[in-house]
Amino acid sequence: MATIQQQKIRIRLKAFDRRLLDTSCEKIVDTANRTGATAIGPIPLPTKRRIYCLLRSPHVDKDSREHFETRTHRRIVDIYQPSSKTIDALMKLDLPAGVDIEVKL
């Protein structure tokens, strides 16, 4: 039996700012829907928390410490049935500098 392979573009987005990430996802989904492709997402992935522990004083006081954290928010957007218009529109899309984008065809 021959199975029909469906074309799919998977876009992974990462950012420290959740609102910036959500607006970028909205732009991608709107662009895909405008060009006739089907967009599924944004699908939220687990947020990674990275905690850094530093000594407050430069000398002996080991009991006094300060904690800092960074949170990396992640989303996935799947685009099914992309046309050449969809790919061109996604390449021309202007997204903020704080969002890391990874595209798989």
Curated annotation (Swiss-Prot):
Keyword ATP-binding: no
GO cellular component, one term: ribosome
Keywords: Ribonucleoprotein, Ribosomal protein
Keyword field contains NAD: no
GO BP: any one term: translation
Family that this chain belongs to: Belongs to the universal ribosomal protein uS10 family.
HAMAP family hit by this protein: Ribosomal_uS10
NCBIfam families in the record: PRK00596.1, rpsJ_bact
Protein name: Small ribosomal subunit protein uS10
Lineage, broadest ranks: Bacteria, Bacillati, Cyanobacteriota, Cyanophyceae, Oscillatoriophycideae
Recorded name of the encoding gene: rpsJ
